[in-house]
From Swiss-Prot:
Heme c 1 binds at residues 79, 93, 96-97. It is found in: Periplasm. Electron transfer subunit of the periplasmic nitrate reductase complex NapAB. Receives electrons from the membrane-anchored tetraheme c-type NapC protein and transfers these to NapA subunit, thus allowing electron flow between membrane and periplasm. Essential for periplasmic nitrate reduction with nitrate as the terminal electron acceptor. This is Periplasmic nitrate reductase, electron transfer subunit. Residues 1-29 form the signal peptide. InterPro entries: Multihaem_cyt_sf, NapB. Gene3D superfamilies: Flavocytochrome C3, Chain A (1.10.1130.10). GO terms for cellular component: periplasmic space. The keyword Oxidoreductase does not apply. The keyword Electron transport applies. Binds 2 heme C groups per subunit. The N-terminus is blocked.
């Protein structure tokens, strides 16, 4: 008979026991977790310290072309670019650096590689992947390095050691 089945009574009792165990366990003081969260590190290995961000360095605007530190290094921008518009529709750098404008502006011409797509096909205009100049070229600023520069290019210069 159905009224005689003892397993019907065990299920509610087991559930009540589990609930009591969970409540008592939650009320007990918890031990310190074994894993502790550490502060984030910045790229120099220092702990994350929130505070005032230092201003950018003063731009060098002498229009002197700088020597590159290694082959294939993109040249730095030796003039101010404050207010230059660089959008999908407008690139003010092209006003001076496109081949047809360099004679009048005296600016160096864009490398021919900027007119080649990824397959090596020469285009009539700057390839879209080279259109945003500041992705590779940066404005030179007068700042002290954050860390000492120990870069050695391994390239043997003619007449050098």
């Amino acid at each position: 008979m159905r009224g005689q089945d003892p397993s019907r009574l065990i299920r509610p009792a087991a559930m009540a026991g589990l609930l009591l165990f969970a409540l008592v366990g939650a009320a007990l003081p918890q031990a310190e977790p074994a894993v502790q969260i550490v502060p984030a590190l910045d790229r120099l290995g220092r702990a994350d310290v929130r505070g005032q961000i230092p201003p950018l360095g003063r731009p060098i605007t002498d229009d002197v072309r700088r020597m590159r530190n290694y082959p294939e290094q993109p040249p730095v921008i030796p003039h101010s670019i404050d207010g230059y518009q660089l959008t999908v529709n407008t690139n003010r750098c092209m006003d001076c650096h496109k081949p047809q404008f360099t004679e009048g502006s005296g600016a160096p011409m864009i490398s021919v590689t900027h007119f080649q797509d990824r397959d090596g096909q020469v285009l009539t205009d700057v390839t879209p992947r080279r259109y945003f100049c500041t992705a590779c070229h940066v404005q030179q600023t007068d700042v002290q390095p954050l860390v000492p520069n120990q870069f050695r290019d391994g390239y043997r210069h003619a007449g050098g050691p």
